[in-house]
UniProtKB/Swiss-Prot annotation:
Keywords: Chaperone, Cytoplasm, Nickel, Nickel insertion. This is Urease accessory protein UreE. One of its GO terms (molecular function) is unfolded protein binding. InterPro entries: UreE, UreE_C_dom, UreE_N, UreE_N_sf. Its main location: cytoplasm.
């Protein structure tokens, strides 16, 4: 079994690929198979953002493994104007839906209830198959691998500091 504990920056060369759905890329513990058919065990640090398409991992034996977002069933949402698209995004955000935001479109995992809601709001909704790379969200925090310049990423949380008055 190829055992992986480390996330690393993207590399120009890799020995294997993992084709994973968004749900699988969100797990810190996972048993899966590489595209080459090798048994893989992921044992990543808990509490980190999901793996992203193109990110690399380093196995215990030193091999580099590239993460690929596997195509999955999505809803591709467009609207007649920016106001309607913003309204659709607001309603999806209110439901804490994982959402990929593009220039003039939104994408979310296929869900017939959300599709009906979006159509009721006047959005055009198309079922597609594509890789899914949603936003990390307001509480996702910074993501980096380098230890150089850590002070640049040491942001104190400002939301929900109850009892603190400035």
């Amino acid at each position: 079994m190829l055992v992986i504990h480390r996330r690393i920056d993207p590399q120009p060369v890799w020995a294997a690929e993992l084709h994973l759905t968004f749900e699988a890329r969100s797990k810190s513990r996972l048993r899966c198979f590489s595209a080459e058919g090798e048994d893989v065990g992921l044992f990543l640090e808990r509490g980190q953002p999901p793996l992203y398409d193109g990110e690399c991992l380093q196995a215990e034996d030193g091999r580099i493994v590239r993460v690929c977002a596997r195509p999955e069933q999505l809803l591709h949402v467009t609207c007649a104007n920016a106001f309607e698209l913003t309204r659709a995004a607001y309603h999806l955000g209110n439901r804490h839906v994982a959402l990929q935001v593009g220039d003039g479109w939104l994408r979310l995992l296929d869900d017939y209830v959300l599709k009906a809601m979006l159509e009721q709001l006047g959005a055009q909704v198309e079922s597609i198959e594509a890789p899914f790379q949603p936003e990390h969200g307001a509480y996702g925090g910074g993501h980096h691998h380098s230890r150089h310049g850590d002070e640049d990423f040491n942001y104190a949380p400002k939301l929900h500091q109850f009892g603190v008055r400035l």
